[in-house]
């Protein structure tokens, strides 16, 4: 049996550990219409959701160049879920209420302004403080455009003391290079 995906905090001298509940946040996946999201990311997030390992308040925003509506995107992802006989329709519906989609050109500053507005709306709707985890499931040649775009509209900037609890994180999935 594999280890639980929970986050643990261990005291260095007492060796006692306790599980931490992740902070409420928005997970923004660039390259969301791709194979990595369908085969790996979404099934992993689904399993975390089923095991109550995601924050109580969260959302997943898929971003990609593919021109899907949010409904079309959710439908395409639903086909990728690892479902078994214990899963009920209400649980699937509840999970997909946390998923939205935004299409656009990663090299366009207009896209990042739209993203900023979308995140503001989703943060308000899900009652979040503006914590964002940006996940780049994209080819390496798109990394610079995405990071520059996030920085240009203030989404990846270090936050000021006026919002001390707000954070942004960036995960780059793809290795750099061509081989």
Where do the language-model regions lie?
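Glycine-rich, phosphate-binding/catalytic loops in enzymes
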Residues: 45-47, 78-79, 151-153
């Amino acid at each position: 049996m594999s280890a639980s995906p929970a986050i643990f905090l261990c005291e260095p001298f007492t060796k006692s550990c306790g599980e931490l509940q992740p902070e409420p946040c928005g997970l923004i996946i660039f390259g969301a219409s791709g194979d990595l999201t369908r085969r790996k990311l979404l099934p992993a997030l689904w399993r975390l959701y089923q095991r109550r390992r995601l924050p109580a308040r969260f959302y997943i925003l898929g971003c990609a160049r593919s021109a899907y509506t949010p409904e079309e995107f959710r439908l395409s992802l639903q086909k990728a879920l690892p479902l078994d006989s214990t899963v009920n329709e209400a649980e699937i519906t509840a999970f997909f209420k946390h998923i939205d989609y935004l299409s656009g050109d990663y090299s366009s500053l207009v896209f990042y302004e739209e993203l900023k507005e979308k995140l503001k709306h989703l943060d308000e709707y899900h009652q979040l403080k503006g914590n964002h985890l940006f996940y780049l499931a994209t080819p390496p040649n798109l990394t610079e455009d995405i990071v520059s775009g996030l920085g240009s509209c203030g989404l990846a900037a270090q936050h000021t003391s006026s919002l001390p609890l707000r954070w942004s994180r960036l995960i780059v999935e793809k290795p750099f290079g061509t081989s």
